[in-house]
Amino acid sequence: MARKQNRNSKELGLAPLADDTSHAGPPGPGRALLECDHLRSGLPDGRRRKDWSCSLLVASLAGAFGSSFLYGYNLSVVNAPTPYIKAFYNESWERRHGRPIDPDTLTLLWSVTVSIFAIGGLVGTLMVKMIGKVLGRKHTLLANNGFAISAALLMACSLQAGAFEMLIVGRFIMGIDGGIALSVLPMYLSEISPKEIRGSLGQVTAIFICIGVFTGQLLGLPELLGKESTWPYLFGVIVVPAVVQLLSLPFLPDSPRYLLLEKRNEARAVKAFQTFLGKADVSREVEEVAESRVQRSIRLVSVLELLRAPYVRWQVVTVIVTMACYQLCGLNAIWFYTNSIFGKAGIPPAKIPYVTLSTGGIETLAAIFSGLVIEHLGRRPLLIGGFGLMALFFGTLTVTLTLQDRAPWVPYLSIVGILAIIASFCSGPGGIPFILTGEFFQQSQRPAAFIIAGTVNWLSNFAVGLLFPFIQKSLDTYCFLVFATICMTGAIYLYFVLPETKNRTYAEISQAFSKRNKAYPPEEKIDSAVTDGKTKGRPEQVSSSTLDNYVKNRIVYMDDLTFQET
């Protein structure tokens, strides 16, 4: 009987819950029969289709378009107008000082312009917990558009104002926007999605980063905005995604987990579940809502507390490793060689920007492929396989670059190697680290976890930009062996440590790490004062909420119904 009750409680995740949440009692008999019919006849494919509600799609697309898209766009948008921006720096300097700018000073100013984006990203990451606690996930994303719009106006007006400092400050502010976006957006998507599609929805972040990179490359073509007279408009375009998000996201609710566990607003949380999952699917979140019974008086964990907590030690280490490998795997270094490799392959210099679009296209297609298969293959194969393939192709690229003058067809192999590295990265390592950060931690730990992940991400980004020129100068084409080693090290670590998180609840993922951590979260510790024979040593969960009572009554009622049928 106990085994049967446990099984039916889990099967409740397939039954509709949302149409009647106004009272704590069980639903009517006729309704329960219909729901049990749904339990018996529901097909996995049908459930998967229902998971993708219109509201969920709009929230993910609007959230990503105004957030991760802008991050990707700002990674590539400065490449095409580089000569014109440097000329603008020189003209501004000469107008103020009466002499041309020194080449070393120009190089320094340009390096600051590019790298200050990462500094702003770090600042934005450190602001996440403070802003997110007050505003929540959705309103933090909305407020973040203020940074994007102000940065766009500064950068777009810098030429007209004759002040290159406006461009530098704008890049810094845009970095703040990116730091907040890459922490809050994955959190938001993770918390509004059912576990069956949490990976696919989380991959939207990476897909829109790639689309942003591709858009920056496309708009930077001379036929569009990549001309001397129009390059400021490349930065003005940033306003468009921000405005789209401001006009669409307010009509959607905040994260139901945030509303329930942090704001303790059960009515709004239930409505949020209904909006995102559809009324027939709200009960899919019952298993995750049960977490609220343990975390009713939730207190956000600080970064220092999370780093010290023994029961999440390996989760934290794994997030640090994956985020460090995400930036240190060498993808940014690939762009340094792209133009020269395309040139050696016989592509005319005027055509190289158009051929470079293929790299952005490969990025986008690989990210979309990952989003389509992640719930079938899982996180482990895509992440470990992605790093492993990158190590293999980096080794191949080292050989082809070393021998590229030996035969006319060798540079074409280098092009294939570059595209293969990009595809390997975007099919797994390009997005899954953000998904794992959201999946590894409970509600109270998640903001601190994203601060740690974001800090590692942006510091690693800055380190690559700072150190790669010296590595390249010292090792030349052999520099890619350094990145191959990093990728292989990451793949080996993840092979032995990373559990599969596909289709698992947050509690199940935490349990998967418990043996390795050799410690359990405080709420899982046994308290003999509140245990009895029925709970077998586990703490009895006391709930006073309307939602918990409703779920409890519903489970009992459906168990009785199933018992009568048998």
From Swiss-Prot:
Residues exposed to the Extracellular side: 73-107, 162-171, 222-231, 338-354, 403-415, 473-478
Chain positions found as Phosphoserine: 9, 514
GO biological process annotation, one example: dehydroascorbic acid transport
UniProt KW keywords: Cell membrane, Glycoprotein, Membrane, Phosphoprotein, Transmembrane, Transmembrane helix
Residues bearing carbohydrate: 74, 90
Positions on the Cytoplasmic side per record topology: 1-51, 129-140, 193-200, 253-316, 376-381, 437-451, 500-566
Record localization: Basolateral cell membrane; Apical cell membrane
UniProt biased composition (Basic and acidic residues): 524-539
Region ranges (Disordered): 1-31, 524-543
Main subcellular localisation: membrane
Family: Belongs to the major facilitator superfamily. Sugar transporter (TC 2.A.1.1) family.
The protein's name: Solute carrier family 2, facilitated glucose transporter member 9
Organism: Pongo abelii (Sumatran orangutan)
